[in-house]
Amino acid sequence: MADTKIASIDPRRNVLTLVNIYEVEPERQAELVQALSETTEQAIRHHDGFVSACIHRSLDGTKVVNYAQWASKQHFDAFVQQPASRELLARFAGIAKSVAPTLCT
């Protein structure tokens, strides 16, 4: 994701942060990281209001963390409400055993 901005953690910035923790079988961790990375680079980053995303993998192989920033909750909601976005999110969830999204300011 060389063209995607790196996340900036600054309490003075007024952005919406999504922390999405996926629980995965260790043999599927790389698959989910690749799917998230490629889809973010090819599609998600082009949506209005997208700021940045960082994909992290746990050392034990059982988790993938997607730390994403959006300009506002309205921008994020608009993205999530699109049928194509719902398909992408379902694809990611299908690779994982569980997913725990948290929205933060």
Question: What positions do the PLM features span?
Answer:
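An amphipathic, aromatic/His-enriched active-site/gating alpha helix that lines ligand/cofactor pockets
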Residues: 2-4, 38-51, 69-103
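Short beta-strand/turn micro-motifs at beta-sheet edges
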Residues: 4-11, 54-55
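Generic hydrophobic-segment detector
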Residues: 10, 39, 58-59
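Short, well-ordered beta-strand segments in beta-rich or mixed alpha/beta enzyme
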Residues: 15-23, 52-82
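Generic detector of low-complexity/intrinsically disordered segments
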Residues: 18-20, 34, 90-91, 105
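Short, surface-exposed ligand-recognition loops at beta-strand->loop->(often short) alpha-helix junctions
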Residues: 23-36
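Flexible, low-complexity linkers/stalks enriched in Thr/Pro that connect modular domains
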Residues: 56, 104-105
